[in-house]
Swiss-Prot record:
GO terms for cellular component: membrane. This is Lipid-A-disaccharide synthase. The gene is lpxB. PANTHER family: LIPID-A-DISACCHARIDE SYNTHASE (PTHR30372), LIPID-A-DISACCHARIDE SYNTHASE, MITOCHONDRIAL-RELATED (PTHR30372:SF4). Pathway: Bacterial outer membrane biogenesis; LPS lipid A biosynthesis. Condensation of UDP-2,3-diacylglucosamine and 2,3-diacylglucosamine-1-phosphate to form lipid A disaccharide, a precursor of lipid A, a phosphorylated glycolipid that anchors the lipopolysaccharide to the outer membrane of the cell. It catalyses: a lipid X + a UDP-2-N,3-O-bis[(3R)-3-hydroxyacyl]-alpha-D-glucosamine = a lipid A disaccharide + UDP + H(+). Its EC number is 2.4.1.182.
Length: 383
């Protein structure tokens, strides 16, 4: 295969992580292949020429979309133009459908094959997108087992490749080693706080979590908190957010997120991929979700699933308590964490349920299987 050029777009932190694994697997098979597009620190480290940072593209809710719309449209225009000028051999799209589907349409017009890795959550809302995807995407790799039959029924050339988190989610140190590394006590109850990877959701949810931490401090003596931060966020900004609340015993962690979560006795986690990561590490958790009132109202009318947390969606039942919108308040969060920590039998039952999730997510090696699919698509387009 001659030197090929691939446009890859990952607009969120999880897509950046999984995209980097995919790029690595493709380069391992075809060392001369080149990539450009949108991503974060992981895709940059993997060698992708970034035209925009995923941190500037990630949004939650209508109000955040409005504030970033101009910049997002500018980036989209540049990428569409690049298809005409650079003529990439393949477009790889990772989730992020409101941005990626218009790009897929442009790729189709320019005769460029489209590989979609990690499905938009059409099973939760906007199922009409299935028809759109069927007409625009040449090949799709999905990471949840129930997605494959859904897309196949819609006429999409789809394969379930397993969940990429199975290859990356693991602690590298024991609980005691991790706590010592962070300068914390090993004999103290530890709670992890995961407020998300997008600045907007962190602004909205971190103050609530920190108030809950203060309530927990009043009820558990002693207790300490680990706050792993996403690499999409600025450390100085995060420290400022924490300082405003002035909570006791909160340690901000950069890097070693999986070690930090695995070392915790319980975790408060914003809805999203982080709930599945926490579950795979075996840490009992509660899921919180909060957006603007308008976004929530519209979402209630459109969303057709019983759960908001990915951990519960995959399990098919409530494994982790969910606190949504008004229920995601400091008092309720603290009460749910106290219930987990104060009832050893309940905590053990949750951990047992979490241990079964891994079996539902397929086998390790998702990126390698997806890489073969993507490279095959490039070779087909050469014929």
């Amino acid at each position: 295969m001659n030197s090929k050029l691939v446009l890859i777009v990952a607009g969120e932190a999880s897509g950046d992580l999984h995209g980097a694994s995919l790029v690595g697997a493709m380069v391992k098979r075809e060392p001369g292949i080149r990539f450009y597009g949108i991503g974060g620190v992981n895709l940059k480290t993997a060698g992708v020429d970034l035209w925009a940072d995923a941190a500037d593209m990630a949004v939650v809710g209508l109000t955040e979309v409005a504030s970033k719309l101009r910049g997002i449209l500018t980036v989209m225009h540049r990428l569409k133009k690049s298809m005409q000028l650079l003529k990439p051999d393949l477009v790889i799209l990772i989730d992020y459908p409101d941005f990626n589907l218009p790009l897929a349409r442009s790729a189709k017009k320019n005769g460029i094959p489209v590989f979609y890795y990690i499905s938009p959550q059409v099973w939760a809302w906007r199922k009409g997108r299935l028809r759109t995807i069927s007409g625009l995407v040449d090949r799709m790799a999905v990471i949840l087992p129930f997605e494959e039959p859904l897309y196949r029924q819609a006429g999409v050339d789809v394969s379930f490749v397993g969940h990429p988190l199975l290859d990356v989610v693991q602690a590298t140190s024991s609980r005691d080693e991790t706590l010592r590394m962070f300068g914390l006590r090993e004999d103290v109850t530890t709670v992890a706080l995961l407020p998300g990877s997008r600045k907007g959701e962190v602004t909205r949810l971190l103050p609530v979590m920190l108030k809950a931490a203060r309530i927990l401090t009043e009820n558990i003596c002693p207790v300490q908190f680990l706050l792993p931060m996403a690499n999409t966020l600025d450390e100085t900004w995060m420290k400022d957010q924490i300082a405003k609340a002035d909570p006791p015993g909160v340690r901000l962690i950069r890097g070693a997120t999986y070690d930090a979560v695995a070392a915790a006795d319980a975790a408060v986690v914003v809805s999203g991929t982080a709930t599945l990561e926490t579950a795979l590490l075996g840490t009992p958790l509660i899921v919180i979700y909060k957006v603007s009132a308008l976004s929530y109202l519209i979402g209630r009318m459109l969303i057709s699933v019983d759960h908001i947390g990915l951990v519960n969606i995959v399990a098919g039942k409530t494994v982790a308590p969910e606190l949504i919108q008004g229920a995601a308040n400091p008092e309720r969060i603290a009460a749910e964490i106290l219930a987990i920590l104060g009832q050893p039998d309940r905590r053990k039952a949750i951990q047992e349920e979490l241990s079964h999730l891994r079996d539902k997510l397929g086998l390790p090696g998702a990126a390698e299987r997806a890489a073969v699919m993507a490279l095959t698509l490039i070779k087909k387009s050469d014929c």
